[in-house]
Regions:
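Residues within the DNA-recognition helix of helix-turn-helix
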Residues: 58
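Alpha-helical DNA-recognition elements
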Residues: 61
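Short secondary-structure boundary/capping segments
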Residues: 4, 69-70
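Amphipathic alpha-helical dimerization/coiled-coil segments
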Residues: 1-10, 14, 85-105
Length: 105
């Protein structure tokens, strides 16, 4: 980032919404599963042992912040991470959490 160049407030507001969405364990579990590929609500529900209504609710929140996207496949909705930036953000957060002493002090 250039010196004296600040990110605009609207963008920072969107960033806070992204971090709010990421602050839930079940949403992170869903996103980590989607890191391996696309999945339906039923598959996510079964794999993570969560109710389908809870999975659908969490996906709606993740979709509202553009962390996941969906497409129709027959009668099912198939979900995936929105783009490579989301995948990178998730991987970096997991790496940061699993290596707490790399930053010094």
């Amino acid at each position: 980032m250039e010196q004296n160049k600040h990110t605009d407030v609207d963008t920072l507001s969107k960033v806070t919404e992204i971090f709010k969405a990421l602050s839930d364990l079940n949403r992170l579990r869903i996103m980590e599963l989607l890191e391996f590929g696309e999945a339906s609500v039923g598959h996510i529900s079964h794999t993570l042992n969560m109710s389908q209504s809870n999975v659908s609710h969490q996906l709606k929140l993740l979709k509202s912040t553009h962390l996941v996207k969906s497409k129709r496949q027959g009668q099912s909705m198939i979900y995936s991470l929105d783009d490579i930036h989301v995948s990178t953000l998730l991987k970096q957060a997991i790496h940061h959490a699993s290596h707490p002493n790399e930053g010094g002090s």
